[in-house]
Amino acid sequence: MTGQSLWDVSEANVEDGEIRINVGGFKRRLRSHTLLRFPETRLGRLLLCHSREAILELCDDYDDVQREFYFDRNPELFPYVLHFYHTGKLHVMAELCVFSFSQEIEYWGINEFFIDSCCSYSYHGRKVEPEQEKWDEQSDQESTTSSFDEILAFYNDASKFDGQPLGNFRRQLWLALDNPGYSVLSRVFSILSILVVMGSIITMCLNSLPDFQIPDSQGNPGEDPRFEIVEHFGIAWFTFELVARFAVAPDFLKFFKNALNLIDLMSIVPFYITLVVNLVVESTPTLANLGRVAQVLRLMRIFRILKLARHSTGLRSLGATLKYSYKEVGLLLLYLSVGISIFSVVAYTIEKEENEGLATIPACWWWATVSMTTVGYGDVVPGTTAGKLTASACILAGILVVVLPITLIFNKFSHFYRRQKQLESAMRSCDFGDGMKEVPSVNLRDYYAHKVKSLMASLTNMSRSSPSELSLNDSLR
């Protein structure tokens, strides 16, 4: 057969230019000119083979006597392939598995762009849906796995109190201080902490009003002594709170790796640094410039509001979302940067001779930023018709640019919020009143890993079950 194609060697033997195809028992005669319309497909390439070896590379078997080509493929899908050779279009029935169909047409060398317009949208949509469902399933699985690891770490920390002096008492204090909502005591402590934080923030804000300031001997505005009392009480409470948590912490090294504990520390450190600086300035007048350091540190009191994250599921979820959404945030900043760069140059070109506020490109950066973020302060506005049209395009582009990444970030926020709720529900269900369970000859981590895993599986169905129904004690029995 060397040097000749299959059609050349079979032309005299194949009646009416036909070849026989057998696909899993489904037999058909096909005209060669029909197949040669699509020479890049498997059957089209089959007609151009010059040797038996080349033929067997494209089919599973070849009968020399019957001139029949056998393919070990699904016979139920081959009629769709036949229809393609006759019409040049692929059609996909709704009951077919799109992935099986995709693999089949890939085998026959038929590209997906041959799918007719009536089926194309549905076909590609059905291919995307399972990928989205798979992503959601992986997201839920990651949520369950992460929650399981965290709840297991929680149990390991609780077990460290066993065998220590006043271990059970310290464990109850640790649970009350670190887990708002765990018990009546923890709820009361949480409410008091929130009130002190809010009182400290309100005091700082009121102290900036001239009506609440008292001039000192040099006529400079100073703090009202009543506000100083509130401030000192707040610092005393925050210090007590931090020291108490540290005293009952199961792991002192791990204590300061917790972001919430670092926030507690940073909320009181500026006060003590300011106190030391003021004492140094009073004793050494030549270091009066250090007083400015004290003024800057006093402004850091506003960060005390972050202490509310310990008592708010939403704030903790927001922090986790920002931590794990750096790619989406970077994408958002990239989109905004590109838009700002383009529209600022356009606005500068149009308005530089008519508007002093837009006479430089850096000035146009500010205008483009407030326009794309739809803030629109109105301090600088274009005056020409072309400038107003540019501003309109800038605002519309900003809306589109901001909306796209925000959707991804919101999905992650929902994911972390759901996971945080699962953790809180599990911790509220814990009861260590009689201490940890004794498990002779069994590794404590392995034991609780086995028991808590079943709990976390049930927590994934919280939407169908009330949190009060999820009792950890029941799962440990």
Curated annotation (Swiss-Prot):
Subcellular location: Cell membrane
Disulfide bond listed as a keyword: no
Regions annotated as coiled coil: none
Topological domains annotated Cytoplasmic: 1-184, 249-259, 312-326, 418-477
Gene3D superfamilies given in the database record: 1.10.287.70, Potassium Channel Kv1.1, Chain A, Voltage-gated potassium channels. Chain C
All ranges on the Extracellular side of the membrane: 207-225, 281-290, 349-361, 382-388
A GO cellular-component term linked to this record: voltage-gated potassium channel complex
Annotated intramembrane regions: 362-373, 374-381
Membrane topology annotation: Multi-pass membrane protein
Motif, Selectivity filter: chain positions: 374-379
InterPro entries: BTB/POZ_dom (IPR000210), Ion_trans_dom (IPR005821), K_chnl_volt-dep_Kv (IPR003968), K_chnl_volt-dep_Kv5/Kv9 (IPR003971), SKP1/BTB/POZ_sf (IPR011333), T1-type_BTB (IPR003131), VG_K_chnl (IPR028325), Volt_channel_dom_sf (IPR027359)
GO MF annotation: an example: voltage-gated potassium channel activity
Membership in a protein family: Belongs to the potassium channel family. S (TC 1.A.1.2) subfamily. Kv9.2/KCNS2 sub-subfamily.
Name of the featured protein: Delayed-rectifier potassium channel regulatory subunit KCNS2
Species this protein is from: Homo sapiens (Human)
Gene that this sequence comes from: KCNS2
